[in-house]
Amino acid sequence: MSEASSKNLSETLFQNHKQAKETSSLTQYMPSSLELLDTRREQSSQAWYRNLRRLQWIWQGVDPVEQEEILARIASSKHSRTHDEWLDTVMGYRSGNWTYEWTRVGMLHQKQAAERQGEEAADQMFAAALYYSIAGYPHLRNDNLALQAQVLANNAYQEAAKLTGFVVKRLEFSYQNKKIAGYLHLRNTDSPKPVVLVSAGLDSLQTDMWRLFRDYLAKRDIAMLTIDMPSLGASSHWPLTEDSSCLHQAVLNQLADLPWVDHFRIGLIGFRFGGNAMARLAFLESDKVKACVSLGAPIHDIFTSPNKLAAMPKMYLDVLASRLGKNVVDVRSLSGQLMAWSLKVQGFMSGRRTKTPILALGLEGDPVSPYSDNQLVALFSQGGQAKKVKSKTISQGYEQSLDLAINWLEDELCK
C-alpha cells in the first residue's frame, strides 16, 4: 500500500469519528456496579484506564523512545477527557486521543516502509501493523475507533507479508458454516515444518505476534499459525464461551490438509487467556498435540475467586464483558458466571493426566496467573513443568520466558 493510499484510507476510516465515543465509557454497568467502579477510580492512584504493557509492546517490536513520546503526548493533552483521573480518556479522534496518537506513529512507519526495500521495508510495515493494533487496544467490540485501527493493522500486515523474504500465507478454515482466518508463517516451503499454533489472548490481535516468529521460531525452522480468540479480531463473529479452545481445536483438526506443515509435530503457545485455551486444547487433543506452553494464563484461581475478579481494573472487566457480549454488566453476576471457565471446574484437572507435556510459565506475584495455577497444570500433564519468572527481572522477563519456552518446545517437537 502506498503512502498516499494509506493516508487516504485512514482519512476515510476516521473522518466521521471526531466525536466517537471514548473507549472507557463504552461498557454499561448496573448502578450498584457503577458506584463501585466510580469509587474505586476516585480513590485509586492509577493514572491510566488501560493497562500499559510497555515491556510486552517493546518485546513485540515497539520502539521504546517512540512509546514514551506517544504516552507523553496523550498525558499532556489539553483536550477534554471522559475521566480526568485517567490520562488516556481523551474524547474524539484528535491529538491526545489514544487511537489517534498510536495511529499517527503507525503511519510514520508505513511511510518509512515505502522508502525502503526488502526486509527493511517489511520490518517497518510489520511495525506499522503493531502500532495500529495497539491503537485499538483493548479492542472492545463496539469501539468504532478501535475497529478502524484494526482495518489498518490487517492491511499493513498483509502488505508486510508481501515484502518479507519469509513466507506468510493467509489461510481460512471452515467452522460452523463460517471461516476462521489465520496467518501461517514459514521460513520457506522446502519441506513440511513442525508448527506451533499461537493464541495472543483476549486483548491482543494475531497480527501482534510477528516477532515471536521472526526472532524465535523461524530460527529453529518451526512454522507459526496464528488464530484470534473467539469474539476478537478475525474471529469476532464467534462468541466467547467456556469452550475457549473451540476455534483452535477446529483449526488443529484441519492441519493435516496443509502441505507445508508436519501435522505429527504440532505445538501450542498461549499468552494470558490464550494460555487457558491452549492448555484446554492440550487436554482435549492429547493425541495430536506434542507440547504446549502457557504464559501467564488464568487457569483456576481467578475464576473461582469472585472478590479477586470484582477487584480487577475496569479495563479488564470491560474486556471480559465485551468478549461475552454483555450489554449491561453486573460485576458480581459476571464473577459468578466466570466460574465455569476454570479448567478444574470443567473437570480437566481432577482425573487423568494429559499425555501432552505442558510448560506453564508465570510472573512472580501475578494475580491473574498465580504459581498455584501453573503447578496444577504441570501436575496433570505428563512431563509437565511449572516455572516462575522472578519479578525483579521483569525487564528481561519476556525474553527469558520466551527463550526458555521456545527451547523447551523445540526439544519436545523434535523428539
From Swiss-Prot:
The keyword Hydrolase applies. InterPro entries: AB_hydrolase_fold (IPR029058), FrsA (IPR043423), FrsA-like (IPR010520), FrsA_esterase (IPR050261). It is an enzyme of class 3 (hydrolase). Pfam families: FrsA-like. It comes from the Bacteria. SUPFAM superfamilies: alpha/beta-Hydrolases. It catalyses: a carboxylic ester + H2O = an alcohol + a carboxylate + H(+). Its EC number is 3.1.1.1. GO terms for molecular function: carboxylesterase activity; hydrolase activity. Keywords: Hydrolase, Serine esterase. Belongs to the FrsA family. Catalyzes the hydrolysis of esters. This is Esterase FrsA. The lineage of its organism: Bacteria, Pseudomonadati, Pseudomonadota, Gammaproteobacteria, Vibrionales.
